[in-house]
């Protein structure tokens, strides 16, 4: 094991002639039948209002070529999640309530520029059919889905766009996983359901080629039957079939439109590495990721219960390692959109994820996630909530220790996200040049085994006492790249025996 010393640096037309002897009498030219003019198809109406976005390499970009990362929230349209504000499939009451919520959210100062819209199965379920599972596809009614796509979902999408927000549509319900299912399988009834849903949505005249609207193909696939016949979520055999499964849906959509598509992973949208080998083909494609405390080696107060995380974590570094292993391979080739994430201390019982904001580079979940996302440079993300009224009720008034609430506790996601999203939208005020740079938690020397990884964390401290993480902005060089390789965002990889200075 070798020691590595770190220091930071910054016709032609052919004319056939015949002899007189072989000349034939000239035949009179018969006029051609006049062609009946063909009706030209009417040009498609362009419904988009927001700046056009597209996928370019690993980034989401606008027409100026600028990288765009979106920040948003979620809405679903079941009365159960909306204070039972309507009953009996009352479209107007649903629209009225949710538009009021959007107005309240904007008035509260939230800086959202996209929404994840659940095409909730409350509207498309045929309740005369037997119940099989929570939010299952087994009771799907195409007739009802078409009706409420026209009457509810598209009008609501138009309202979001009028407020400056892109819309990411998510299909009704969740992927099958528990009995009577073991997961999903190429050619199964759920794949046929998704093909039908996206065939309908991608041909809708107000959605087709409308760049304000994007598609998240499915919600939380867990296991898939691999090419080896075994169900799982991480093996090469599973991702070989995941590529086939979702490629067919991508191809169906692309036969109609070019809207941006977000492809889910496996294991509740936490496993993606296999897609680096079994790539989804086509343009305007990114990956939709879920992230909760305890996943990816992150800190949590309590396990969220899916069986893919834990109630312990190793602070920043173990979180970063887990992210790099499970999401990193696709983040290197395509943009990422985190379509579910939240956290709050366990005592509030207000979020799916139980953890604290913590400190970037240290303990906790929220600040470390933001740090990882910011360093990646191509991650859009949101506040996963089913309670819009809480966002509308938010007040930007600090709480007092001992009297904090879910909404104003700095260790819960609403307070942190409100201010972070504001910074993303308005920019960060930097008070002059930094007074000093700090390498967080570093020693003068460090040893790494071959193939070992370590993450530098660079903090800038300003004269007014404020500080911010600047790792992604720092220039970090190795004195010997044959020994120690420096990857973006402070990642150091030991590639050969020897010594190197950073």
Task: Give the positions of each predicted feature.
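N-terminal carbohydrate-binding accessory modules
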Residues: 27-116, 128-139, 425
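Sec-dependent signal peptide recognition
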Residues: 2-10
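Aromatic-lined substrate-binding rim segments of carbohydrate-active enzymes
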Residues: 91-176, 193-194, 245-257, 353, ...
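C-terminal motif of bacterial Sec signal peptides marking the signal peptidase cleavage site
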Residues: 15-17
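A broad structural signal for short, well-ordered beta-strand segments within beta-sheet-rich domains
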Residues: 53, 98-99, 162, 432-438
């Amino acid at each position: 094991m070798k020691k590595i010393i770190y220091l930071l640096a910054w016709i032609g037309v052919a004319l056939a002639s015949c002899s007189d002897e072989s000349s034939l009498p000239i035949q009179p030219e018969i006029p051609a039948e006049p062609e009946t003019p063909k009706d030209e198809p009417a040009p498609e109406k362009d419904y988009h209002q927001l700046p056009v976005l597209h996928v370019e390499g690993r980034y989401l970009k606008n027409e100026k070529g600028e990288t765009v990362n979106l920040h948003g929230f979620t809405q679903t349209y079941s009365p159960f999640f909306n204070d039972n504000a309507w009953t009996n499939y009352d479209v107007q009451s649903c629209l009225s309530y949710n538009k009021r919520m959007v107005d309240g959210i904007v008035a509260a100062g939230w800086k959202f520029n996209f929404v994840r819209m659940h095409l909730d199965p409350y509207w498309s379920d045929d309740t005369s059919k037997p119940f099989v599972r929570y939010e299952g596809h087994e009771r799907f009614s195409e007739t009802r889905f078409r009706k409420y796509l026209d009457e509810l979902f598209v009008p609501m999408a138009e309202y979001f766009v009028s407020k400056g927000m892109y819309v990411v549509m998510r299909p009704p319900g969740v992927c099958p996983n528990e009995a009577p299912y073991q997961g999903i399988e190429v050619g199964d009834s759920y794949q046929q359901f998704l093909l039908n849903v996206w065939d309908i949505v991608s041909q809708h005249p107000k959605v087709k080629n409308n760049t304000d609207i994007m598609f998240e193909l499915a919600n939380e696939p867990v296991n898939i039957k691999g090419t080896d016949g075994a169900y799982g979520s991480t093996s090469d055999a599973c991702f070989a079939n995941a590529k086939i499964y979702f490629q067919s849906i991508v191809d169906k959509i692309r036969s109609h439109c070019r809207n941006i598509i977000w492809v889910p992973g496996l294991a509740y949208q936490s496993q993606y590495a296999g897609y680096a080998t079994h790539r989804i083909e086509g343009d305007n494609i990114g990956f939709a990721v879920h992230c909760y405390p305890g996943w990816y080696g992150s800190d949590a107060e309590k396990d969220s219960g899916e069986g893919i995380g834990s109630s312990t974590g190793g602070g920043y570094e173990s979180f970063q390692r887990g992210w790099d292993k499970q999401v990193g391979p696709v983040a290197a080739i395509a943009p990422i959109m985190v379509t579910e994430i939240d956290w709050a201390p366990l005592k509030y019982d207000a979020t799916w994820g139980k953890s604290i904001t913590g400190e970037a580079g240290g303990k906790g979940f929220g600040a470390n996630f933001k740090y990882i996302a910011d360093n990646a440079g191509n991650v859009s993300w949101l506040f996963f909530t089913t309670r819009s009224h809480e966002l509308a009720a938010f007040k930007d008034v600090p709480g007092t220790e001992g009297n904090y609430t879910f909404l104003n506790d700095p260790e819960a996601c609403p307070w942190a996200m409100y201010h972070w999203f504001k910074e993303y939208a308005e920019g960060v005020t930097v008070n002059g040049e930094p007074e000093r740079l700090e390498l967080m938690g570093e020693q003068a020397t460090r040893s790494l085994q071959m193939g070992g990884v370590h993450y530098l964390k660079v903090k800038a401290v300003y004269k007014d006492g404020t500080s911010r993480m600047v790792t992604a902005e720092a220039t970090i060089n190795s004195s010997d790249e044959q020994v120690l390789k420096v990857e973006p965002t402070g990642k150091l990889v030991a590639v050969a025996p020897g010594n190197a200075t950073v």
